[in-house]
């Protein structure tokens, strides 16, 4: 697996949206962030060469959930995700830690865990027809942009 294949797979899951944030991290959300979607996986697009020998180097971090978290940490190449371990995220050092089917199972489980935690209001928005959902997201982004502009003044 690699970042491109992971992205292609994740975008086939229901309601998945991706954004690039934090200088070179591809973030996957269940539902658009503008309507309250929640993040479930983060893929490092660029590996800083200074991190090559760093023990905290990672290619992906994702939500493992409290049941699977400790089990995954026993596997070589997996460690608590920096800044997100308290919410049961794990980080993986390289793509060869799992086979393709295992990656798909792990990330599908992360998606399902996150979807289950979405508030009812967000789930209702995700159940709307695509065109209506798109309008809602555009309206919400306008509101958020106006709030940000007012705050900047």
Give residue ranges: language-model regions:
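Charge-dense, helix-prone N-terminal extensions
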Residues: 1-153
């Amino acid at each position: 697996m690699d970042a491109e294949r992971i992205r292609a797979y994740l975008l086939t899951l229901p309601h998945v949206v991706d954004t690039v944030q934090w200088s070179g991290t591809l973030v996957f959300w269940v539902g658009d962030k503008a309507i309250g979607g929640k993040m479930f996986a983060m893929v490092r697009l660029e590996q800083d060469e200074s991190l090559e020998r760093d023990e905290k180097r990672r290619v992906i971090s994702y939500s493992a959930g409290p049941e699977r978290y400790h089990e995954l940490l026993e596997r070589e190449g997996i460690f608590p995700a920096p800044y997100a371990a308290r919410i049961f995220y794990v980080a993986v050092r390289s793509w060869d830690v799992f086979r393709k089917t295992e990656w798909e199972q792990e990330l599908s489980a992360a998606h399902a865990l996150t979807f289950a935690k979405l508030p009812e209001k967000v789930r209702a928005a995700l159940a709307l027809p695509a065109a209506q959902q798109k309008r809602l997201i555009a309206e919400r982004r306008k509101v958020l942009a106006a709030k940000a502009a007012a705050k900047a003044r």
